[in-house]
Amino acid sequence: MSRPDPEAVEKMHRFFAVECNNRAWELTEQASRSEEETHEMRTNAHAAAYHWAVIGPPVNRMRARMLLAEVAAQDGNGALALSLAQSGCEFFEKEDGTDWDRAFATLELAYAHAVSGQHEEVSSLLEKATARGEQLAEKSEREFFAENHQRISGLIAKL
């Protein structure tokens, strides 16, 4: 079998990065999942991270890490979630992240702190995330952020 040309390979990586990313996020947002869906969520998150690592710019690689932080938090792996979320927040504060990236990373960091049992940081991080979310330029971004904030706040409340 001959190897496809590099441009075709890059397009395939991009296709799978986007598809796996979107499916993993879709599964994280479900109120409940079967064991099979949980496995699918994990697999897609890691696959997305792999494909972005091969072809993505640093910002997309870091967004994939934030997805991994969400999955780790939902799995109850606080140490991993915290490590991934902290690196994401640091990156988006210093690099080319958008206002959305900074707001969402702060929300993920609050969730990771809660799952890690470091509850003293959670309230201030949620407040910071709320303020950042309210300042998003696009109404659709503000609404989507508010939905995620509500979802994650609900998950935190169950801990």
Indicate where each model-derived feature is located:
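Amphipathic alpha-helical segments of tetratricopeptide repeats
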Residues: P6, W25, A45-A53, Q86-K94, ...
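Residue signature of alpha-solenoid helical repeat architecture, marking inter-repeat boundaries
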Residues: K11-E19, T38-H39, V59, W100, ...
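Residue register of alpha-helical TPR repeats
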Residues: V18-E19, R63, F104, E143-F144
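Helix-turn-helix repeat elements of alpha-solenoid scaffolds
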Residues: E35-A47, N77-Q86, L125
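Alpha-helical linker/edge segments of TPR/alpha-solenoid repeat scaffolds
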Residues: A110-H119, H149-L159
